[in-house]
Amino acid sequence: MTTVTVTTEIPPRDKMEDNSALYESTSAHIIEETEYVKKIRTTLQKIRTQMFKDEIRHDSTNHKLDAKHCGNLQQGSDSEMDPSCCSLDLLMKKIKGKDLQLLEMNKENEVLKIKLQASREAGAAALRNVAQRLFENYQTQSEEVRKKQEDSKQLLQVNKLEKEQKLKQHVENLNQVAEKLEEKHSQITELENLVQRMEKEKRTLLERKLSLENKLLQLKSSATYGKSCQDLQREISILQEQISHLQFVIHSQHQNLRSVIQEMEGLKNNLKEQDKRIENLREKVNILEAQNKELKTQVALSSETPRTKVSKAVSTSELKTEGVSPYLMLIRLRK
């Protein structure tokens, strides 16, 4: 009689659930046990087939010999019983014993398959729990990242609005400076024209004064023109006063012109500074716009709902246990 004892260790369910982080090792262990059970079943089938072949061949031979021997003895003495005739009953008992052993082996095999199914379901539950926790952690982290990105986006938007407001103010200041500069330029042009007219008038008065002085010299040489000389002297004095006053006005206008030119130079320098500030603000606004677009893209990607699947254990057993708990099946077999 051949006896095959199958021993396998099934990890406790509570330990597998507590060590869900080692689900990869559990899956490998389940697959290894599955392959081991398959090998055992194949071996048992081969043993059973071989045992039946040997027993049938041996029983057939013994049966023929016993039948022939019993026939010969029966002719000699019908009342006497040959002990070899009882070998058939013994053989039948052996066959029944083998059948019982095979039945026990099959039952053990079924128990192993049920335990394997229970272990596989426990591993699948552990995998689902781990996947669920990972998914929840991912959702939490994604929400935190999305919130940070939203805060950064709002902060960038506020900074952008502030920069745009400053840029607008600087542009207005620049326009005002440009208007003042244009006014100063017009004022300078008017002052230059006024000074030119005054210079021309001054030259005219000087020429008239010189002409009167020459005429006065000519009249002084003659004593008969005393009254005319006095009139000429009076006119020359008036011209001199006009020339002096005109010279004072021209000097004042030159000072005003220099002052306006200096103001214009200051406005030009201010205009250059405003241009630089506006250019810097435009660069900052462009940078903020680029960062804002990038954050919008990141927020859009983060807000998309990820599609996740919870992994399930793959069935590697031929045992059909749909709708029935493995533990209930194990209890039924033990009864």
UniProtKB/Swiss-Prot annotation:
Tissue expr: Expressed in bone marrow, colon, small intestine, spleen, testis, trachea and cutaneous T-cell lymphoma (CTCL).
Cellular localization per UniProt: Cytoplasm, Cytoskeleton, Microtubule organizing center, Centrosome, Centriole
Predominant location: cytoplasm
Residue ranges the record marks as coiled coil: 101-305
Any one biological process term the GO annotation gives: microtubule anchoring at centrosome
GO cellular component terms attached to this protein's record: centriolar subdistal appendage; centriole; cytoplasm
Keyword Cytoplasm: yes
Function field: Centriolar protein required for centriole subdistal appendage assembly and microtubule anchoring in interphase cells. Together with CCDC120, cooperate with subdistal appendage components ODF2, NIN and CEP170 for hierarchical subdistal appendage assembly.
Name listed for the protein in its UniProt record: Coiled-coil domain-containing protein 68
Species for this entry: Homo sapiens
